[in-house]
């Protein structure tokens, strides 16, 4: 028999927080949130004391005085400039020291790294009052990592005629995008949730705020499948938001990127965009990485994507993580990852995504010719993007590289993948 669940708004809030705390989160207190800098200062200082006591001493952060205030404003400014993901990944410089704000996920068997990761503080705070101007307005829930906000939530209950659509409207009409917490890059996503569906927005912009579904899909359609053990949406906090999963999103998916756009008059301008994976993208990449790790090389997989489903980012995320995939002996699973496409937009998308990862950008190459492609392969360039037309020219070269292992990501959703060229790639 399906268990009874309190799905009122407050009941859903309590349920999510209870499950997150059971999985290792800390329950934060709304009073620890400093609105002027949009930080949970209590959790931030707890992390710094546990991981970098000398930094705390050098910067005089234990005392509630001018040095601490200067550091908090420095950190707030860096998040404004670089986005929360980059600040978590790379930390900040302040005065004579570098301050780490996050400890990376450990590689298998790395005990020291596992211990360091365990010192991260993932916290969830209920009814967070975020505004100095409208002091009574509160978000249902906010998730922080080491005191830095990463996700906000508005929760609704369909049983009382309040649905995820109402949560979306609340974000669009009642949440001032000028508030520090809601500015672009401050959080990785803002999530509207009820007991049946999840949607998210990466950039709150009033009534034009655009929310995308974050559902599992059901019967080859939208929504979520029935859940005999609880709510349809509990995959969100039981799978996606658990510490290791959210850390993986921060490290390998979410990022603030810069794009060049052209207006109606042909003038180009640069805009910033927060990237966050949709559920099907996350599931696809993780499943392929898992299968590649267990199955080894030499297998084929077909990934079906519909138009507008974010295939370019999915390919880019998969490519950069396949490069880092390790076999049991600790050796790289693949010597190179080759992406085959004839769409310049995809090449641009991959380049932009890859370059956000400093440790990967230097090993990315785009081949303009068969000779360049041959050179990249022989020199061991890790990620190579080429066109379907050029690939057959180096099939003979691959024979000379028989001791190498390659992963091929083939974009097949366009017309040029037909005839002899495609046949050769499918050999």
Annotate each language-model stretch with its function:
Residues 2-336, 345-361, 379-382, 389, ...:
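ATP-dependent helicase/translocase motor core
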Residues 323, 373-378, 398-399:
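Extracellular/periplasmic ectodomains of large secreted or surface enzymes and adhesion receptors
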């Amino acid at each position: 028999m399906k268990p009874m669940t309190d799905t009122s708004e407050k009941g859903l809030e309590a349920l999510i927080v209870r499950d997150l705390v059971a999985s290792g989160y800390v329950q934060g207190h709304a009073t620890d949130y400093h609105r002027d800098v949009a930080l949970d200062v209590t959790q931030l200082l707890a992390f710094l004391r546990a991981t970098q006591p000398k930094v705390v001493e050098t910067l005089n952060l234990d005392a509630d005085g001018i040095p601490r205030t200067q550091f908090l404003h420095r950190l707030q400014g860096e998040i404004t400039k670089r986005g929360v993901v980059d600040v978590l990944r790379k930390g900040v410089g302040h005065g004579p020291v570098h301050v780490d704000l996050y400890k990376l996920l450990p590689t298998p068997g790395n005990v020291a790294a596992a211990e360091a990761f365990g010192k991260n503080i993932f916290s969830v705070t209920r009814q967070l009052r975020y505004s100095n101007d409208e002091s009574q307005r509160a978000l249902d829930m906010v998730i922080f990592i080491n005191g830095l906000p990463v996700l906000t939530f508005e929760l609704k209950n369909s049983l009382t005629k309040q649905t995820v659509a109402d949560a979306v409207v609340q974000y669009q009409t009642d949440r001032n995008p000028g508030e520090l917490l809601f500015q672009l890059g401050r959080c990785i996503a803002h999530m509207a949730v009820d007991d049946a569906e999840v949607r998210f927005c990466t950039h709150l912009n009033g009534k034009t705020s655009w929310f995308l579904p974050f559902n599992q899909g059901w019967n080859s359609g939208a929504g979520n499948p029935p859940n005999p053990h609880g709510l349809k949406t509990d995959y969100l906090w039981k799978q996606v938001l658990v510490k290791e999963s959210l850390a993986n999103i921060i490290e390998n998916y979410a990022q603030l990127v810069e794009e060049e756009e052209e207006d109606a008059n042909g003038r180009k301008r640069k805009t910033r965009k927060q990237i966050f994976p949709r559920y099907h993208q996350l599931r696809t990449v993780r499943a392929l990485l898992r299968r590649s790790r267990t199955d080894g090389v030499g297998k084929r997989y077909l990934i079906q994507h519909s138009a507008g489903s974010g295939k370019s980012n999915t390919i880019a995320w998969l490519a950069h993580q396949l490069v880092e995939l390790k076999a049991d002996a600790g050796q790289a699973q693949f010597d190179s990852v080759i992406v085959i496409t004839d769409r310049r937009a995809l090449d641009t998308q991959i380049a932009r995504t890859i370059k956000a990862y400093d440790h990967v950008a230097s090993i990315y190459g785009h081949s303009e010719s068969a000779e360049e492609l041959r050179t990249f392969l022989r020199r061991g360039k890790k990620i190579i993007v080429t066109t379907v037309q050029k690939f057959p020219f180096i099939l003979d070269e691959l024979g000379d590289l028989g001791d190498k292992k390659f992963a091929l990501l083939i974009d097949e959703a366009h017309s040029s993948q037909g005839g002899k060229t495609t046949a050769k790639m499918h050999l």
